[in-house]
């Protein structure tokens, strides 16, 4: 009886351990697959290189358009909208990590001038919150509040992303001035082709690593292929591994060249970057401009009145 209880206890512990292990795997895998902006955050101190190139282009190789819209000028300590548009054909499907086809996701990085930052929730109006949807923005670094990243997000719902931005106040931030500032943006649709470690994803074309004859093609049980090539130079065998997702373009017995595509290129997405300018406007300048315009209008009114008065005097003198 005691042995039976011991066996049941051990069995229960093993079952719990397996369950916990599965849960950890699922959670970890989900966090990695759904958090690709963290690749740039972990690998680069600044997402914009000295050349002006945004580092997301290192993984998303295809070039696609992106657009940003901001106000021409804003006042200090004011919340405004920065609208990023990532256009693409909504009918397109991308290759997922499991080799199946699915909808495209989108992501973006917004690089603001120093002092500008994501608006706190209590400063965002209900109208702007409705435009934002359920997106969760985050800072690129805890000490870089002017750089904001978002994604991945469902592309069909968020091909237009509204960032709520709070402008700085030079009265409280002495390193901020009333000037014209640049804003940079990068946006992608779809998965990348290269991982940060340099390895390929299954969302890209695979080329032959050797010239020769395709001697054997083995379709793997879980998807993908093993392609054996007899090297043309010395006859040794080279095995190229193709993951599930890309479509095979070669067949057994075919003669191929070095770097010849073995698969199609399944990528339908891409990355783009753009920029805009915004003026941090001094309220005193606006007041001065309004005062100047008012004085000009008053001067014109007085001039017209004076002219009419002069005409009346002339008419009176002519009557006598």
Swiss-Prot record:
Gene Ontology MF term list: electron transfer activity; heme binding; iron ion binding
Xref: Pfam families: Apocytochr_F_C, Apocytochr_F_N
Parts of the chain that traverse the membrane: 286-306
Chief place of localization: plastid
InterPro entries xref list: Cyt-f_TM, Cyt_f, Cyt_f_lg_dom, Cyt_f_lg_dom_sf, Rudment_hybrid_motif
Cofactor(s) required for function per UniProt: heme
Keywords: Chloroplast, Electron transport, Heme, Iron, Membrane, Metal-binding, Photosynthesis, Plastid, Signal, Thylakoid, Transmembrane, Transmembrane helix, Transport
Cofactor: binding details: Binds 1 heme group covalently.
Gene Ontology biological process: photosynthesis
Positions contributing to heme binding: 36, 56, 59-60
Signal peptide: 1-35
Subcellular location: Plastid, Chloroplast thylakoid membrane
Membrane topology classification: Single-pass membrane protein
Record-level GO cellular component terms: chloroplast thylakoid membrane
Family: Belongs to the cytochrome f family.
Record-linked PANTHER family: CYTOCHROME F (PTHR33288:SF10), PTHR33288
Function: Component of the cytochrome b6-f complex, which mediates electron transfer between photosystem II (PSII) and photosystem I (PSI), cyclic electron flow around PSI, and state transitions.
Subunit structure: The 4 large subunits of the cytochrome b6-f complex are cytochrome b6, subunit IV (17 kDa polypeptide, petD), cytochrome f and the Rieske protein, while the 4 small subunits are PetG, PetL, PetM and PetN. The complex functions as a dimer.
Name of the protein in question: Cytochrome f
Species assigned in the record: Dioscorea elephantipes (Elephant's foot yam)
High-level lineage: Eukaryota, Viridiplantae, Streptophyta, Embryophyta, Tracheophyta
């Amino acid at each position: 009886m005691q042995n039976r209880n011991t066996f049941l206890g051990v069995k229960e512990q093993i079952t719990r351990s397996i369950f916990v292990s599965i849960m950890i795997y699922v959670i970890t895998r989900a966090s990695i697959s759904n958090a690709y902006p963290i690749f740039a955050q972990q690998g680069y101190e600044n997402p914009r290189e000295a050349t002006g190139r945004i580092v997301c282009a290192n993984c998303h190789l295809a070039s696609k358009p992106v657009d940003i819209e901001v106000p021409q000028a804003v006042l200090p300590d004011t919340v405004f909208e920065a609208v990023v548009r990532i256009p693409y054909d909504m009918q397109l499907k991308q290759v997922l990590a499991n080799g199946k086809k699915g909808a495209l996701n989108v992501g973006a990085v917004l690089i603001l001038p120093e002092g500008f930052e994501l608006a706190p929730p209590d400063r965002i109006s209900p109208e702007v919150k409705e435009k934002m949807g359920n997106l969760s923005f985050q800072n690129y670094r805890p000490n870089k509040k002017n750089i904001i990243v978002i994604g991945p997000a469902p592309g069909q719902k968020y091909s237009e992303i509204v960032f709520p931005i709070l402008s700085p106040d030079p009265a409280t931030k002495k390193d901020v001035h009333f000037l014209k500032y640049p804003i940079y943006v990068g946006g992608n649709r779809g998965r990348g082709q290269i991982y940060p470690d340099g390895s390929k994803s299954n969302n890209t074309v695979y080329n032959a690593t050797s010239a020769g004859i395709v001697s054997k093609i083995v379709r793997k049980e879980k998807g993908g292929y093993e392609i054996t090539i007899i090297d043309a130079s010395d006859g040794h065998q080279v095995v190229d591994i193709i993951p599930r997702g890309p479509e095979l373009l070669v067949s057994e017995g075919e003669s191929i060249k070095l770097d010849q595509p073995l698969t199609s290129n399944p990528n339908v997405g891409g990355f783009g970057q753009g920029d805009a300018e915004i003026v941090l406007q001094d309220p005193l300048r606006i007041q001065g401009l309004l005062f100047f315009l008012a004085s000009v209008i008053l001067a014109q009114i007085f001039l017209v009145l004076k002219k009419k008065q002069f005409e009346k005097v002339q008419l009176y003198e002519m009557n006598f």
